[in-house]
Amino acid sequence: MQLELLNEQGQAASKFDAPETVFGREFNEDLVHQIVIAYRANARQGTRAQKDREQVRHTTAKPFKQKGTGRARAGMSSSPLWRGGGRIFPNLPEENFTQKINKKMYRAGMVAILSQLAREGRLAVVDSLKLESPKTKVLADKFKAMNLESVMVIAEEVDENLYLASRNLKNVFVVEPRYADPVSLVHYKKVLVTKGAIDKLKEMFE
C-alpha cells in the first residue's frame, strides 16, 4: 500500500510504501461497528444516577383530602406522577456497561479502520513533527499550510513541545501509537502519521 508523503507545505512530495498487513486489509463494517461501540461503552464512568420515590425528600403527608376536591386521588407528593417525584425505573450508578472485545478482534478492527482511511485518502504520512519550541502558533501554521482543519496525529513520540503546542488547538488530537483508539480514528477527517509511528503500528498490529 502506497501512502502520500507530505512535506511541510502539505503537498505530496513522494510516495511511501506502507505495510500491507496494516494498511492493505479489507474493511469489515460489522467488526468496526462492534469495537467502536465497545470502546465507547467501556469509556463510560457509570456514575449516572436518579432517585426513586423512596429516595426523594418529600413529606409523606397526603397532599389533599381523598374525596370532594374533584381531583384525582393522591397519596404523597413523591409519587412518580408528580413533578419532582421519584422515577419509576431510575438509572442506577452500579449499572455495568462493560463490553468485552478480545485482542484479536480489536487488532483486526483497528487494521480495518487504518486500511479504509488509506483507501479514502484520509491518511497521510510525514517524516516527523519535531518542534524546537512549544509554540501553538508554529504548529497551527503547519496544519494550516497542510489544509488540515480536523486532524488526528499519530507520532512515534509525543514530547513536551509537541504536547504543549497541540493541546490548545481545536479539532487536533495528538497521540502515540499505543494510545490510538477506534473512535478517534473514525471521528477526525484526516489522520497524519509519522514514519516512526508506522513502524510502531506495524509491531502492534502485525
UniProtKB/Swiss-Prot annotation:
HAMAP family in alphabetical order: Ribosomal_uL4_B (MF_01328_B)
Family as reported in the entry's similarity comment: Belongs to the universal ribosomal protein uL4 family.
Free-text function comment from the UniProt entry: One of the primary rRNA binding proteins, this protein initially binds near the 5'-end of the 23S rRNA. It is important during the early stages of 50S assembly. It makes multiple contacts with different domains of the 23S rRNA in the assembled 50S subunit and ribosome. Forms part of the polypeptide exit tunnel.
Gene3D superfamilies the record matches: 3.40.1370.10
InterPro entries in the record: Ribosomal_uL4, Ribosomal_uL4-like, Ribosomal_uL4_dom_sf
Stretch list, region Disordered: 46-78
Record keywords, A-Z: Ribonucleoprotein, Ribosomal protein, RNA-binding, rRNA-binding
Protein name listed in UniProt: Large ribosomal subunit protein uL4
Molecular functions per Gene Ontology: rRNA binding; structural constituent of ribosome
Natural source organism: Delftia acidovorans (strain DSM 14801 / SPH-1)
Subunit structure: Part of the 50S ribosomal subunit.
Keyword Heme: no
Top-level taxonomy: Bacteria, Pseudomonadati, Pseudomonadota, Betaproteobacteria, Burkholderiales
One annotated GO biological process: translation
A single Gene Ontology CC term: ribosome
Domain of life: Bacteria
NCBIfam families the UniProt entry points to: rplD_bact
